[in-house]
Regions:
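ABC transporter nucleotide-binding domain
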Residues: 172-262
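An acidic, carboxylate-rich microenvironment
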Residues: 58, 71, 93, 108, ...
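Structured loop/turn residues at secondary-structure junctions
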Residues: 125, 135, 190, 230-232, ...
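Residues at or immediately flanking beta-strands
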Residues: 60, 129, 226, 281-284
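ABC transporter nucleotide-binding domains
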Residues: 3-7, 12-206, 211-212
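C-terminal coupling/interaction segments
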Residues: 263-304
Length: 304
């Protein structure tokens, strides 16, 4: 089976500015792909080109086996970063209207809308006007509008923005459910924890260029592991241990907690052995694996 999404050498220039520079990646069927990068990295321009909303300056894009997403628009679901629904419509009417544009009959669209609203805890709000819903509720309605027609490819641009932790967790469940039924999900986010929990694969952009393309585990491997020490400690002594590249100290109520980032190639054993040999007062220690957020900073030079 062919990939759901293929980009080969895609470039987008606006006058003399290159927003996307020779970008290539693939999203497989049923895969959850995190499309990550700081502001201005080129994510939105890429999404617009994938959807056929603008043409690339160079390169090739294949969506669900065709060269133009507009030919298969009824098989694609899209949640834009800038939300917008008709404020005087009810959730049922808004969802049914957008579903009709994707080829669903009105009765089927309204039936699905009510079922999905109920599943998201919005059954009681189904017939209230959108302007009377909270921001979180309205975002749920817009998400339902993007997936009510059961698309094969779902593109979500910053879907977690503005959601409280409970609704963020609920959205994670929706994304997993989409992938479980075979849909490909591509989502952009600045919240690395979501990508870390959800993604089979991540593509990371910085200044229009791809700087990483692989699994979350592979991404984390580019950042250093850390040795965390607690006790009556001196940061300078810890920083001087073999294999330690840098350190950060935090004063707790009755002890010092020092996180020592290890140099490339160091497993921390040498530093730990030296610490005990020097008689450092260590009451607790742990080896900590890097997070995706830390890998993001290493790869892009910027915070998420």
């Amino acid at each position: 089976m062919s990939a759901a999404l293929i980009l080969e050498g895609v470039t987008k220039r606006y006058g003399g500015f290159t927003a996307v520079d020779d970008l290539s990646f693939t999203a497989g069927r049923g895969q959850i792909l995190g499309f990550l990068g700081p502001n201005g990295a080129g994510k939105t321009s890429t999404i617009r080109m994938i959807l056929g909303l603008m043409e690339p300056t160079a390169g090739r894009i294949e969506v669900l086996g065709v060269d133009d997403a507009r030919k298969v628009r009824n098989r694609i679901g899209f949640l834009p970063e800038e939300r917008g629904l008709y404020r005087r419509m009810t959730p049922v009417d808004a969802i049914a209207f957008l579903a009709g544009l994707k080829g669903l009959s009105r009765p089927e669209a309204r039936k699905r809308a009510r079922i999905m609203l109920e599943a998201q805890g919005l059954g009681a709000a189904a017939d209230r006007q959108m302007r009377n819903l909270s921001k979180g509720m309205a975002q749920k309605v817009q998400l339902i509008s993007a997936i009510v027609h059961e698309p094969e490819l779902v593109i979500l641009d910053e879907p977690f923005s503005g959601l409280d932790p409970v609704n963020q967790q609920a959205l994670e469940g929706v994304i997993r459910g989409l992938a479980a039924r075979g849909a490909t999900v591509v989502f952009s986010t600045h919240v690395m924890q979501h990508a870390e929990r959800l993604c089979d694969h991540v593509v990371l952009l910085a200044r229009g260029k791809k700087v990483f393309d692989g699994t979350v585990t592979q991404a984390r491997a580019v950042a250093p592991r850390s040795l965390v020490l607690e006790g009556t400690l001196d940061e300078a002594a810890v920083k001087a241990l073999p294999g330690v590249a840098s350190s950060h100290a935090e004063q707790a109520e009755d002890h010092m907690r020092i996180t020592a980032a290890l140099a490339s190639g160091s497993n921390g054993q040498e530093a730990l052995k030296a610490a005990f040999a020097q008689g450092l007062d260590i009451t607790r220690f742990e080896m900590r694996e890097p997070s995706l957020h830390e890998a993001f900073i290493v790869l892009t030079g910027e915070a998420a």
